[in-house]
Each structure stands twice: as C-alpha cells, then as structure tokens.
C-alpha cells in the first residue's frame, strides 16, 4: 500500500506494475553491478550501502539497510560490468520521515562526491513513501540507454535527521562491453605528442633498415 506523501519539484511520475514471477527477472540488474567497487558516501556503517542492491524476492528483508550518517544525504556510485539501458527504479524505505523524498540520477560520472552534486542531474524524481516496492519510477530511456556507471543522489528526506533505505531495485537491459572499444579509449586517453612523433618516424626507420 503506497502512502500519499509527495514532494514538490522534479518528476513524481510512478507506476504500479503487476507483481508476478517475472518481476524478479526484470529487476536483475543488481547482478551486473561491480559490488566490490560500489561506493556509498555518508553511510553510517561501512559497506551497508551495497546491501540494498539485492534480489527482488529479498526486497522486504528488514535486516539489511543503509542509514545516512551526518545528515539526510546519501550518494551511491554504482559501476556496472557492462553497458546498461536503465528503464526504471524502485526504492523501499520506512513509513516515516526517514524515507527519501528526492532521488537524483547521474550517468557515467565515476567517483562522484557531494561537491559534484551541484551540477544538473540527468533525471530527478520526487518520491512517495513506499514500504513494499509498489512504485516504480520510469527513467527517460533515451537518456539512460548506454550507462556504464550510475550515481544515485538522495538529496533529502521527509524531515528526519537521517535517511534509511532497505532496497533499491534497478530495471533494464545489460550488454557486455566490447574489450576492443575499451582498449581504444584507454589509448586515446593516454595519447601524447611523443606517441605521434614515434609513429611518423617509424616508417622511415623501417625503410632505412
């Protein structure tokens, strides 16, 4: 049962899809997260931010959660093991003011800090209190069609000093990253004038020898 808490600003569009066996498959993107490299800034207990990304069938496990430390904000840096087309997001919290009121998404900005959250988000949602995962917030799919890294900024809650989250579900499609594309990107990032000079004189050297 969803509650009628709403928050001004941003998009508050949500849907209530049917809860069948296929729902667990739809929310399987947690398997494509590089959990060892996932970061959650301002978590009160180290490593607890990772625990909220889990199987749909385990979404109501209240023993696993993340709680903010100094204030109400949380920032998740989520690297994927390939490229993701993100279609929707579900968030479960408590039926209290600790529930997040606003969620902001940033794509392909690794290692974000709170200082970086002043930039415009790729999409912002105003959240309603959801204790069972009944509400899905659909993303702008065209904007999130090629995501290798996702940052989730919980910017505010409904008035409590700290924020508490039990579950975050990500729905979408995953494709394996092509190794040769990564190699090309790495080369271009490391390119310098010396590299180009070497390539220019190499044919001449081969000709002389």
Curated annotation (Swiss-Prot):
A single GO cellular-component term on record: cytoplasm
GO biological process assignments: positive regulation of DNA-templated transcription; positive regulation of megakaryocyte differentiation
PROSITE patterns in the record: PITH
Any Pfam family: PITH
Subcellular localization, as worded in the UniProt entry: Cytoplasm
Chief place of localization: cytoplasm
Keyword Cytoplasm: yes
PITH domain mapped to chain residues: 18-190
Cited InterPro entries: Galactose-bd-like_sf, PITH1-like, PITH_dom, PITH_dom_sf
Domain of life: Eukaryota
Family, similarity comment: Belongs to the PITHD1 family.
Function (record text): May play a role in promoting megakaryocyte differentiation by up-regulating RUNX1 expression.
Protein name: PITH domain-containing protein 1
Organism listed in the record: Xenopus laevis (African clawed frog)
Gene, per the UniProt record: pithd1
